[in-house]
Protein backbone atom coordinates (compact mmCIF):
# COMPACT_ATOMS: atom_id res chain seq x y z
CA UNK A 1 0.00 0.00 0.00
CA UNK A 2 1.35 3.42 -0.93
CA UNK A 3 2.05 6.11 1.65
CA UNK A 4 -0.85 8.21 0.36
CA UNK A 5 -3.26 5.28 0.71
CA UNK A 6 -1.97 4.60 4.22
CA UNK A 7 -2.66 8.20 5.20
CA UNK A 8 -6.16 8.15 3.69
CA UNK A 9 -7.07 4.95 5.55
CA UNK A 10 -5.19 5.86 8.71
CA UNK A 11 -6.92 6.25 12.10
CA UNK A 12 -8.05 9.69 13.23
CA UNK A 13 -5.07 9.99 15.59
CA UNK A 14 -2.70 9.84 12.63
CA UNK A 15 -4.69 12.49 10.78
CA UNK A 16 -4.40 14.78 13.80
CA UNK A 17 -0.61 14.70 13.40
CA UNK A 18 -1.05 15.67 9.76
CA UNK A 19 -2.72 18.88 10.92
CA UNK A 20 -0.66 19.65 14.04
CA UNK A 21 2.61 17.83 14.66
CA UNK A 22 2.61 15.80 17.86
CA UNK A 23 -1.16 15.57 18.46
CA UNK A 24 -1.30 11.99 17.24
CA UNK A 25 1.55 11.00 19.53
CA UNK A 26 -0.26 12.62 22.48
CA UNK A 27 -3.40 10.64 21.69
CA UNK A 28 -1.36 7.41 21.62
CA UNK A 29 0.04 8.21 25.07
CA UNK A 30 3.49 9.32 23.90
CA UNK A 31 3.37 12.50 25.96
CA UNK A 32 7.01 13.63 25.89
CA UNK A 33 7.47 12.93 22.18
CA UNK A 34 4.20 14.65 21.33
CA UNK A 35 5.09 17.71 23.41
CA UNK A 36 8.50 17.94 21.74
CA UNK A 37 6.88 17.92 18.30
CA UNK A 38 4.33 20.54 19.40
CA UNK A 39 7.05 22.76 20.90
CA UNK A 40 9.10 22.44 17.72
CA UNK A 41 6.07 23.43 15.67
CA UNK A 42 5.42 26.39 17.96
CA UNK A 43 9.04 27.54 17.65
CA UNK A 44 8.90 27.31 13.86
CA UNK A 45 5.62 29.23 13.74
CA UNK A 46 7.04 31.96 15.99
CA UNK A 47 10.22 32.21 13.89
CA UNK A 48 8.41 32.47 10.56
CA UNK A 49 5.85 34.90 11.98
CA UNK A 50 8.55 37.09 13.55
CA UNK A 51 11.01 37.26 10.65
CA UNK A 52 11.29 33.98 8.73
CA UNK A 53 8.57 34.83 6.20
CA UNK A 54 10.12 38.26 5.68
CA UNK A 55 13.55 36.67 5.19
CA UNK A 56 12.13 34.27 2.59
CA UNK A 57 10.62 37.20 0.71
CA UNK A 58 13.89 39.12 0.99
CA UNK A 59 15.81 36.49 -0.93
CA UNK A 60 13.71 37.39 -3.98
CA UNK A 61 13.65 41.19 -3.57
CA UNK A 62 17.08 41.77 -1.97
CA UNK A 63 15.54 44.76 -0.22
CA UNK A 64 12.99 47.42 -1.06
CA UNK A 65 13.73 50.16 1.47
CA UNK A 66 16.56 52.54 0.60
CA UNK A 67 18.53 53.97 3.52
CA UNK A 68 18.22 57.72 4.09
CA UNK A 69 20.15 59.08 7.06
CA UNK A 70 18.66 62.57 6.68
CA UNK A 71 15.15 61.24 7.10
CA UNK A 72 16.19 58.67 9.69
CA UNK A 73 15.23 55.74 7.46
CA UNK A 74 17.19 52.57 8.20
CA UNK A 75 17.25 50.84 4.85
CA UNK A 76 17.63 47.20 3.88
CA UNK A 77 21.00 45.49 3.56
CA UNK A 78 20.83 43.37 0.39
CA UNK A 79 23.56 40.88 1.27
CA UNK A 80 22.27 40.49 4.81
CA UNK A 81 18.83 39.79 3.39
CA UNK A 82 20.30 37.23 1.00
CA UNK A 83 22.12 35.28 3.68
CA UNK A 84 19.20 35.47 6.12
CA UNK A 85 16.92 34.31 3.32
CA UNK A 86 19.17 31.31 2.76
CA UNK A 87 19.06 30.60 6.49
CA UNK A 88 15.26 30.76 6.35
CA UNK A 89 15.31 28.26 3.47
CA UNK A 90 17.43 25.91 5.59
CA UNK A 91 14.99 26.27 8.49
CA UNK A 92 12.13 25.53 6.09
CA UNK A 93 13.89 22.39 4.87
CA UNK A 94 14.41 21.36 8.50
CA UNK A 95 10.71 21.99 9.21
CA UNK A 96 9.67 19.78 6.28
CA UNK A 97 12.05 17.02 7.42
CA UNK A 98 10.64 17.27 10.94
CA UNK A 99 7.09 17.09 9.60
CA UNK A 100 7.92 13.97 7.56
CA UNK A 101 9.51 12.32 10.60
CA UNK A 102 6.40 13.17 12.62
CA UNK A 103 4.14 11.50 10.03
CA UNK A 104 6.36 8.42 9.76
CA UNK A 105 6.52 8.10 13.53
CA UNK A 106 2.76 8.31 14.06
CA UNK A 107 2.14 5.85 11.20
CA UNK A 108 4.54 3.38 12.81
CA UNK A 109 2.85 3.86 16.17
CA UNK A 110 -0.60 3.28 14.64
CA UNK A 111 0.57 0.02 13.01
CA UNK A 112 2.00 -1.17 16.32
CA UNK A 113 -1.26 -0.28 18.10
CA UNK A 114 -3.27 -2.17 15.45
CA UNK A 115 -1.21 -5.26 16.26
CA UNK A 116 -2.10 -4.89 19.91
CA UNK A 117 1.34 -3.71 20.94
CA UNK A 118 1.91 -0.89 23.36
CA UNK A 119 3.42 2.25 21.77
CA UNK A 120 7.05 2.89 22.62
CA UNK A 121 7.74 5.17 25.56
CA UNK A 122 10.10 8.11 25.14
CA UNK A 123 12.90 6.14 26.79
CA UNK A 124 12.37 3.22 24.41
CA UNK A 125 12.40 5.61 21.44
CA UNK A 126 15.71 7.07 22.63
CA UNK A 127 17.14 3.57 23.05
CA UNK A 128 16.04 2.66 19.51
CA UNK A 129 17.63 5.86 18.16
CA UNK A 130 20.88 5.06 19.97
CA UNK A 131 20.89 1.43 18.86
CA UNK A 132 19.13 0.51 15.65
CA UNK A 133 19.29 4.01 14.14
CA UNK A 134 22.53 5.18 15.70
CA UNK A 135 23.95 6.15 12.30
CA UNK A 136 21.09 8.63 11.86
CA UNK A 137 21.54 10.12 15.33
CA UNK A 138 25.31 10.37 14.92
CA UNK A 139 25.03 12.18 11.58
CA UNK A 140 22.56 14.84 12.69
CA UNK A 141 25.08 17.27 14.19
CA UNK A 142 27.71 16.83 11.42
CA UNK A 143 25.06 17.41 8.75
CA UNK A 144 23.81 20.54 10.50
CA UNK A 145 27.39 21.79 10.87
CA UNK A 146 28.23 21.13 7.21
CA UNK A 147 25.01 22.81 6.11
CA UNK A 148 25.67 25.90 8.24
CA UNK A 149 29.40 26.37 7.71
CA UNK A 150 30.01 24.82 4.27
CA UNK A 151 26.84 24.61 2.19
CA UNK A 152 25.41 27.99 3.23
CA UNK A 153 28.55 30.03 2.33
CA UNK A 154 28.94 28.17 -0.98
CA UNK A 155 25.32 28.76 -2.00
CA UNK A 156 25.64 32.38 -0.86
CA UNK A 157 28.68 32.84 -3.11
CA UNK A 158 26.95 31.19 -6.07
CA UNK A 159 23.89 33.40 -5.71
CA UNK A 160 26.02 36.52 -5.30
CA UNK A 161 27.46 35.85 -8.76
CA UNK A 162 23.99 36.52 -10.16
CA UNK A 163 23.57 39.94 -8.54
CA UNK A 164 25.01 43.37 -9.31
CA UNK A 165 26.49 43.69 -5.82
CA UNK A 166 29.91 45.36 -5.81
CA UNK A 167 31.67 48.43 -7.12
CA UNK A 168 29.26 51.31 -6.59
CA UNK A 169 26.44 48.95 -5.57
CA UNK A 170 27.35 48.36 -1.93
CA UNK A 171 25.42 49.10 1.24
CA UNK A 172 23.46 51.36 1.61
CA UNK A 173 22.73 51.04 -2.14
CA UNK A 174 20.31 48.18 -2.80
CA UNK A 175 21.50 45.31 -4.96
CA UNK A 176 19.31 43.39 -7.40
CA UNK A 177 19.37 40.13 -9.30
CA UNK A 178 21.40 40.61 -12.46
CA UNK A 179 23.69 38.91 -14.97
CA UNK A 180 25.92 41.97 -15.18
CA UNK A 181 28.92 40.15 -13.66
CA UNK A 182 28.74 37.43 -16.32
CA UNK A 183 28.22 39.99 -19.07
CA UNK A 184 31.42 41.71 -17.96
CA UNK A 185 33.69 38.67 -17.66
CA UNK A 186 32.33 37.01 -20.81
CA UNK A 187 32.05 40.23 -22.80
CA UNK A 188 34.59 42.02 -24.98
CA UNK A 189 35.31 44.92 -22.63
CA UNK A 190 38.27 45.52 -20.35
CA UNK A 191 37.05 43.02 -17.74
CA UNK A 192 36.30 40.35 -20.34
CA UNK A 193 39.68 40.83 -22.02
CA UNK A 194 41.46 40.51 -18.69
CA UNK A 195 39.46 37.39 -17.85
CA UNK A 196 40.40 35.73 -21.14
CA UNK A 197 44.11 36.47 -20.80
CA UNK A 198 44.28 35.37 -17.17
CA UNK A 199 42.26 32.20 -17.86
CA UNK A 200 44.62 31.10 -20.65
CA UNK A 201 47.66 31.83 -18.49
CA UNK A 202 46.06 30.09 -15.49
CA UNK A 203 45.46 26.86 -17.43
CA UNK A 204 48.99 27.00 -18.90
CA UNK A 205 50.44 27.57 -15.43
CA UNK A 206 48.50 24.69 -13.86
CA UNK A 207 49.38 22.17 -16.59
CA UNK A 208 53.06 23.09 -16.96
CA UNK A 209 53.78 23.46 -13.24
CA UNK A 210 52.09 20.12 -12.48
CA UNK A 211 54.14 18.44 -15.23
CA UNK A 212 57.38 20.03 -13.98
CA UNK A 213 56.70 18.94 -10.42
CA UNK A 214 55.82 15.38 -11.42
CA UNK A 215 58.67 14.70 -13.81
CA UNK A 216 61.13 16.60 -11.61
CA UNK A 217 60.19 14.56 -8.54
CA UNK A 218 60.18 11.30 -10.51
CA UNK A 219 63.53 12.13 -12.10
CA UNK A 220 65.20 12.82 -8.76
CA UNK A 221 63.70 9.64 -7.28
CA UNK A 222 65.02 7.58 -10.22
CA UNK A 223 68.44 9.23 -10.03
CA UNK A 224 68.84 8.71 -6.29
CA UNK A 225 67.56 5.16 -6.62
CA UNK A 226 70.53 4.13 -8.78
CA UNK A 227 72.91 1.74 -7.07
CA UNK A 228 76.01 3.55 -8.33
CA UNK A 229 74.99 6.85 -6.68
CA UNK A 230 77.04 7.24 -3.53
CA UNK A 231 75.52 8.86 -0.47
CA UNK A 232 71.99 8.78 -1.88
CA UNK A 233 70.53 9.18 1.61
CA UNK A 234 72.47 12.40 2.10
CA UNK A 235 71.47 13.76 -1.32
CA UNK A 236 67.85 12.84 -0.66
CA UNK A 237 67.91 14.96 2.50
CA UNK A 238 68.47 18.22 0.60
CA UNK A 239 65.09 18.23 -1.20
CA UNK A 240 63.42 17.20 2.05
CA UNK A 241 64.93 20.27 3.76
CA UNK A 242 63.47 22.47 1.03
CA UNK A 243 60.11 20.77 1.61
CA UNK A 244 60.34 21.25 5.38
CA UNK A 245 60.85 25.03 5.18
CA UNK A 246 57.49 26.90 5.17
CA UNK A 247 56.52 27.81 1.63
CA UNK A 248 56.00 31.52 2.19
CA UNK A 249 59.53 31.82 3.66
CA UNK A 250 60.95 30.25 0.49
CA UNK A 251 58.86 32.60 -1.65
CA UNK A 252 60.03 35.68 0.24
CA UNK A 253 63.61 34.43 0.03
CA UNK A 254 63.42 34.08 -3.75
CA UNK A 255 61.71 37.47 -3.97
CA UNK A 256 64.72 39.03 -2.24
CA UNK A 257 67.19 37.13 -4.43
CA UNK A 258 65.55 38.30 -7.67
CA UNK A 259 64.71 41.83 -6.51
CA UNK A 260 66.24 44.90 -8.13
CA UNK A 261 68.90 45.19 -5.42
CA UNK A 262 69.13 41.46 -4.67
CA UNK A 263 72.21 39.22 -4.82
CA UNK A 264 71.61 38.05 -8.41
CA UNK A 265 71.45 41.58 -9.82
CA UNK A 266 74.44 42.58 -7.71
CA UNK A 267 76.44 39.76 -9.30
CA UNK A 268 75.29 40.86 -12.76
CA UNK A 269 76.28 44.48 -12.23
CA UNK A 270 79.58 43.48 -10.60
CA UNK A 271 80.44 41.44 -13.71
CA UNK A 272 79.72 44.39 -15.99
CA UNK A 273 76.16 43.47 -17.08
CA UNK A 274 73.00 45.49 -16.70
CA UNK A 275 70.58 44.64 -13.93
CA UNK A 276 67.52 42.66 -15.02
CA UNK A 277 64.00 43.61 -13.98
CA UNK A 278 63.01 40.11 -12.88
CA UNK A 279 59.90 40.98 -10.86
CA UNK A 280 59.34 44.66 -11.66
CA UNK A 281 56.12 46.15 -13.01
CA UNK A 282 57.41 46.46 -16.57
CA UNK A 283 56.47 44.52 -19.68
CA UNK A 284 59.98 43.11 -20.14
CA UNK A 285 59.67 41.32 -16.78
CA UNK A 286 56.58 39.34 -17.83
CA UNK A 287 58.22 36.04 -18.72
CA UNK A 288 61.06 36.50 -16.25
CA UNK A 289 58.50 36.67 -13.46
CA UNK A 290 56.50 33.76 -14.86
CA UNK A 291 59.60 31.60 -15.20
CA UNK A 292 60.71 32.40 -11.66
CA UNK A 293 57.23 31.39 -10.49
CA UNK A 294 57.62 27.98 -12.18
CA UNK A 295 61.04 27.58 -10.56
CA UNK A 296 59.88 28.54 -7.06
CA UNK A 297 56.81 26.30 -7.28
CA UNK A 298 59.03 23.41 -8.40
CA UNK A 299 61.41 24.09 -5.52
CA UNK A 300 58.53 23.82 -3.05
CA UNK A 301 56.57 20.95 -4.64
CA UNK A 302 59.11 18.56 -6.19
CA UNK A 303 60.33 17.11 -2.85
CA UNK A 304 56.87 15.78 -1.95
CA UNK A 305 56.55 14.08 -5.35
CA UNK A 306 60.06 12.68 -4.93
CA UNK A 307 59.15 11.12 -1.58
CA UNK A 308 55.97 9.53 -2.94
CA UNK A 309 57.55 8.18 -6.12
CA UNK A 310 60.51 6.79 -4.16
CA UNK A 311 58.14 4.53 -2.25
CA UNK A 312 56.24 3.60 -5.41
CA UNK A 313 59.41 2.72 -7.34
CA UNK A 314 60.54 0.38 -4.57
CA UNK A 315 57.37 -1.68 -5.10
CA UNK A 316 57.93 -2.34 -8.81
CA UNK A 317 58.96 -5.94 -9.46
CA UNK A 318 62.56 -5.91 -10.75
CA UNK A 319 61.82 -9.03 -12.81
CA UNK A 320 59.83 -6.82 -15.17
CA UNK A 321 62.97 -4.87 -16.03
CA UNK A 322 65.03 -8.05 -16.37
CA UNK A 323 62.50 -9.53 -18.79
CA UNK A 324 62.38 -6.27 -20.75
CA UNK A 325 66.18 -6.18 -21.00
CA UNK A 326 66.23 -9.76 -22.30
CA UNK A 327 63.69 -8.75 -24.95
CA UNK A 328 65.99 -5.92 -26.02
CA UNK A 329 64.03 -3.00 -24.61
CA UNK A 330 66.03 0.20 -24.16
CA UNK A 331 66.17 2.14 -20.90
CA UNK A 332 63.74 4.71 -22.29
CA UNK A 333 61.33 1.99 -23.44
CA UNK A 334 61.44 0.40 -19.99
CA UNK A 335 60.70 3.77 -18.45
CA UNK A 336 57.82 4.44 -20.86
CA UNK A 337 56.26 0.97 -20.69
CA UNK A 338 56.91 -0.09 -17.07
CA UNK A 339 57.93 2.72 -14.75
CA UNK A 340 55.73 5.54 -15.99
CA UNK A 341 52.43 3.58 -16.17
CA UNK A 342 52.99 2.10 -12.71
CA UNK A 343 53.82 5.46 -11.12
CA UNK A 344 51.03 7.35 -12.90
CA UNK A 345 48.52 4.71 -11.84
CA UNK A 346 49.54 5.03 -8.21
CA UNK A 347 49.82 8.80 -8.13
CA UNK A 348 46.91 9.94 -10.33
CA UNK A 349 44.75 11.21 -7.44
CA UNK A 350 47.76 13.12 -6.09
CA UNK A 351 48.44 14.65 -9.51
CA UNK A 352 44.81 15.77 -9.74
CA UNK A 353 45.17 17.36 -6.32
CA UNK A 354 48.41 19.03 -7.46
CA UNK A 355 46.70 20.37 -10.57
CA UNK A 356 43.84 21.86 -8.55
CA UNK A 357 46.30 23.25 -6.00
CA UNK A 358 48.41 24.84 -8.73
CA UNK A 359 45.33 26.22 -10.47
CA UNK A 360 44.39 27.96 -7.20
CA UNK A 361 47.95 28.77 -6.10
CA UNK A 362 47.42 32.20 -4.62
CA UNK A 363 50.73 32.54 -2.82
CA UNK A 364 53.40 32.13 -5.52
CA UNK A 365 52.94 35.35 -7.45
CA UNK A 366 51.34 37.25 -4.59
CA UNK A 367 54.48 36.87 -2.48
CA UNK A 368 56.89 37.22 -5.41
CA UNK A 369 55.41 40.42 -6.83
CA UNK A 370 53.48 41.79 -3.86
CA UNK A 371 50.08 41.82 -5.58
CA UNK A 372 51.06 44.60 -8.01
CA UNK A 373 48.76 45.59 -10.86
CA UNK A 374 50.16 45.98 -14.37
CA UNK A 375 50.05 49.43 -15.92
CA UNK A 376 50.39 47.92 -19.39
CA UNK A 377 48.74 45.21 -21.48
CA UNK A 378 45.15 46.30 -20.82
CA UNK A 379 44.77 44.39 -17.55
CA UNK A 380 41.89 45.42 -15.29
CA UNK A 381 43.07 45.44 -11.65
CA UNK A 382 45.50 42.59 -12.37
CA UNK A 383 49.03 41.83 -13.49
CA UNK A 384 50.34 39.58 -16.25
CA UNK A 385 51.34 36.92 -13.70
CA UNK A 386 48.08 36.90 -11.75
CA UNK A 387 46.05 33.71 -11.66
CA UNK A 388 42.27 33.80 -11.43
CA UNK A 389 42.46 33.41 -7.66
CA UNK A 390 44.79 36.45 -7.42
CA UNK A 391 42.51 38.51 -9.64
CA UNK A 392 39.52 37.44 -7.58
CA UNK A 393 41.31 38.72 -4.47
CA UNK A 394 42.13 42.06 -6.10
CA UNK A 395 38.56 42.51 -7.31
CA UNK A 396 36.67 41.53 -4.18
CA UNK A 397 38.93 42.39 -1.24
CA UNK A 398 40.73 45.47 -2.54
CA UNK A 399 38.13 46.96 -4.89
CA UNK A 400 34.72 45.65 -3.71
CA UNK A 401 33.73 43.98 -7.02
CA UNK A 402 32.05 41.17 -5.12
CA UNK A 403 29.70 39.81 -7.78
CA UNK A 404 32.48 39.60 -10.37
CA UNK A 405 34.70 37.87 -7.81
CA UNK A 406 31.91 35.40 -7.02
CA UNK A 407 31.42 34.69 -10.74
CA UNK A 408 35.16 34.06 -11.15
CA UNK A 409 35.20 31.70 -8.16
CA UNK A 410 32.31 29.81 -9.74
CA UNK A 411 34.27 29.54 -12.99
CA UNK A 412 37.28 28.22 -11.05
CA UNK A 413 35.11 25.59 -9.39
CA UNK A 414 33.56 24.47 -12.68
CA UNK A 415 36.92 24.22 -14.46
CA UNK A 416 38.81 22.41 -11.70
CA UNK A 417 35.89 20.17 -10.76
CA UNK A 418 35.09 19.18 -14.35
CA UNK A 419 38.69 18.57 -15.40
CA UNK A 420 39.47 16.63 -12.23
CA UNK A 421 36.43 14.40 -12.66
CA UNK A 422 37.09 13.77 -16.36
CA UNK A 423 40.78 12.99 -15.86
CA UNK A 424 40.13 10.66 -12.94
CA UNK A 425 37.27 8.82 -14.67
CA UNK A 426 39.45 8.26 -17.75
CA UNK A 427 42.59 7.31 -15.83
CA UNK A 428 43.90 3.79 -15.30
CA UNK A 429 43.62 4.33 -11.55
CA UNK A 430 39.83 4.27 -11.99
CA UNK A 431 39.29 2.03 -15.03
CA UNK A 432 42.00 -0.61 -14.48
CA UNK A 433 42.32 -0.82 -10.73
CA UNK A 434 42.78 -4.58 -10.76
CA UNK A 435 45.64 -4.45 -13.30
CA UNK A 436 48.28 -3.28 -10.82
CA UNK A 437 47.07 -5.18 -7.77
What is the meaning of each model-derived region?
Residues 2-14, 19-27, 31-34, 38-46, ...:
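N-terminal signal-anchor/first transmembrane alpha helix
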Residues 49-59, 134-437:
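A structural signal for multi-pass alpha-helical bundles of membrane permease subunits
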